[in-house]
A protein has these predicted regions:
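Small/polar loops that bind or transfer phosphate-bearing groups
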Residues: 79, 107, 125
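Short coil-to-beta transitions that initiate beta-strands within beta-rich domains
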Residues: 59, 107-113
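Conserved beta-strand positions that form and line the central face of beta-propeller blades
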Residues: 104
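Beta-propeller domain segments
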Residues: 1-101, 132, 136-139
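Blade-level signature of beta-propeller repeat domains, shared across WD40, Kelch, NHL, RCC1
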Residues: 113-142
Length: 142
């Protein structure tokens, strides 16, 4: 799974096998990037998640949730945005649905630089500014 910071318009997350062509510099996420000549999107491996600059400006890759503490997240890809502090989940793509809708899980006043995963599948958010590792837990309303 590749989280790719965009150029001007889109942040993207793709599943790419070794050597896959994600389209740069002709495509950005699932859109042609007009500054660099002709573009045929079917030539490239598209993103399964993309979001625009109104949601964030620098995607931070995460993990597929495999823990037992939050069953509702099981099998979902958890990722974030470094600038906005938003954390999202998205189902992995399938042949029936190659593009996934992402759901915001929370927004924090933090610079989320990475995630960590414990042996039991517990996920942690890494805060760049404070050097902290914060455990992801279910909200008390769940």
């Amino acid at each position: 799974i590749v989280a790719d910071v965009g150029q001007d318009t889109w942040e993207e997350v793709s599943i790419a096998a070794a050597g896959a062509n994600l389209g740069w510099s002709r495509a950005e996420a699932n859109s042609c990037f007009a500054k660099h000549g002709p573009c045929t999107l079917s030539d490239y491996k598209g993103a399964f998640v993309q979001y625009g600059r109104e949601e964030g400006k620098s995607v931070t890759g995460g993990y597929v949730y495999r823990g037992a503490q939050i069953p509702a997240l099981k099998g979902l890809y958890i990722f974030a945005d470094f600038v906005s502090g938003r954390i999202w989940s998205a189902p992995l793509p399938s042949t029936k649905s190659p593009v996934s809708a992402h759901v915001q899980l929370g927004q924090f006043g933090r610079l989320i630089s990475s995630f960590g995963q414990a042996d039991d599948g517990t996920l942690y958010v890494l805060d760049f500014a404070k050097g902290a590792a914060l455990k992801i837990v279910a909200s008390s309303s769940n």
